Swiss-Prot record:
A GO cellular-component term linked to this record: cytosol
Subunit structure and binding partners: Monomer.
GO biological process: gluconeogenesis; glycolytic process
Matching SUPFAM superfamilies: Phosphoglycerate kinase
Family listed: Belongs to the phosphoglycerate kinase family.
Protein name from the UniProt record: Phosphoglycerate kinase
Binding-site positions, ATP: E332, G358, G359, H360, S361
Pathway(s) per entry: Carbohydrate degradation; glycolysis; pyruvate from D-glyceraldehyde 3-phosphate: step 2/5
Naturally occurring in which organism (per UniProt): Thermococcus onnurineus (strain NA1)
Reactions catalysed according to its record: (2R)-3-phosphoglycerate + ATP = (2R)-3-phospho-glyceroyl phosphate + ADP
Gene name of the record: pgk
Main location: cytoplasm
């Protein structure tokens, strides 16, 4: 795959596909984490004298955070100390004319790419290639740099459609992500511990199945709704209130799948031994085998309990490699953040090479100033897809582009 330092960019028109999709509150972007993550790539291209065209999506149609990229332009301008012009167009005449008049070292950001219907659908590369987006913009570009790791599991025109038409190059963030995740997945250092939490239960089950079946993990610790499903699969009852909630989320349908994983790998999947419920607004911990478990019938489980935190901490402190995705509970409420913070702090304090991902996981790491984690991934779904053994469309597109252009391009100094 092409790396950013393989080429020189002075006077070249470069389309940078970033993923600046960010949380929004009251119409304003409230986190610049993804902007900062892609900053080294942008700075390198501008320092080299590229004519830079930035593209990103923001949310999806009909959502409250489905906004224009005008604020994205402001945030980038402030971080870079130079103007990144907001262009209220994607591939229409206005955008194309502005791209043609770019000067070396200048940058623009196109309108929210998902304002174009083509970029909302997932289609194979060949179909993406035939879209208006690709056909209108490709003739104006010299290179495509892709730094949108968080969207690496998606196949859309702006992400993969240009790969056979122009050299598609990994940005610094993409390269860092691929290297860190590959190291964690391929290593033979033991013990290798996976921590699976949060609400993406089906994705987490795929990860568990893949890493256990292929000898890539030695133990899996579970929490969040993933932990709920595995706890039910072990035959424990989590009470009417929690079963009702899980039924609404469609999670009870996944219990059989979790049972099958346990049938094959029972000793290698750990589940919580106690939970914390919201008892009239307070945190009350209940042991899974205690007489107080009647509380599960009336009150929601919002975190793992202290005994589980300690058991997980002991395992993590002795790990050599840790992969974690998703929180242990509803960390947004301080009294139910103990599990997430306790587990992530243990990961940071351990001597292991650690990779942590998932939007909520990242938010909790920054919120509680957790340090010592080797690599904080910008991708949640993309990271889960990677560890579940799926082929990621963007990584496939990088390979296709490399094979097509490796002999035809005059490489810059390394």
């Amino acid at each position: 795959m092409f790396r950013l330092t393989d080429f020189t960019y002075h006077g070249k028109t470069v389309f940078l596909r970033a993923d600046l999709n960010s949380p929004v509150k009251d119409g304003r972007i409230i986190s610049d984490a993804r902007f900062r993550a892609v900053l080294p790539t942008i700075q390198h291209l501008l320092d080299e004298g590229a004519k830079l065209v930035i593209g990103t999506h923001q949310s999806k149609p009909y959502k409250g955070d489905y906004i224009t990229t005008e604020q994205h332009a402001e945030i980038l301008s402030n971080l870079l100390g130079q103007e990144v012009e907001y262009v209220e167009d994607i591939f229409g005449k206005y955008a194309r004319e502005r791209i043609k008049t770019l000067k070396p070292g200048e940058a623009i950001i196109l309108e929210n790419l998902r304002f174009a219907a083509e970029d909302v659908k997932y289609k194979p590369l060949e179909e993406c290639e035939r879209t208006h987006f690709v056909r209108k913009l490709a003739p104006l570009l010299d290179y495509v740099v892709n730094d949108a790791f968080a969207a690496a599991h998606r196949s859309q025109p702006s992400l993969v459609g240009l790969a056979r038409l122009k050299p598609m190059i990994m940005g610094f963030l993409m390269e860092k992500e691929v290297e860190a995740l590959s190291r964690a997945y391929e290593t033979n250092e033991k013990p290798r511990i996976y921590v699976l939490g949060g609400a993406k239960v089906d994705d987490s089950l795929r990860v568990a199945e893949n890493v256990l079946r292929n000898g890539r993990a030695d133990l899996i610790l579970t929490g969040g709704l993933v932990g709920h499903v595995f706890t039910l699969a072990k035959g424990f009852h989590l009470g009417d209130a929690n079963l009702e909630f899980m039924a609404k989320k469609g999670l009870l349908e996944l219990v059989d799948w979790a049972e099958n994983i346990l049938d094959e790998f029972y000793p290698y999947v750990r589940t919580p031994v106690d939970f914390a419920v919201d008892y009239k607004g307070e945190r009350v911990e209940v042991d899974l085998l205690s007489d107080e478990k009647w509380l599960f019938d009336k009150y929601p489980i919002l975190d793992i309990g202290s005994r589980t935190i300690e058991k997980y901490r002991d395992v993590l402190m002795n790990a050599r490699v840790i992969v974690a995705n998703g929180p242990m509970g509803v960390f947004e409420r301080e009294e139910f953040a103990l599990g997430t913070v306790g587990v992530f702090r243990a990961i940071g304090e351990s001597q292991a090479f650690s990779v942590v991902g998932g939007g909520h996981s990242i938010a909790s790491i920054y919120q509680y100033n957790i340090t010592g984690i080797s690599h904080v991934s910008t991708g949640g779904g993309a990271m889960l897809s990677f560890f579940s053994g799926e082929k990621l469309p963007i990584l496939e597109a990088f390979r296709i582009s490399y094979e097509r252009f490796k002999d035809k391009i005059e490489r810059g100094p390394k």
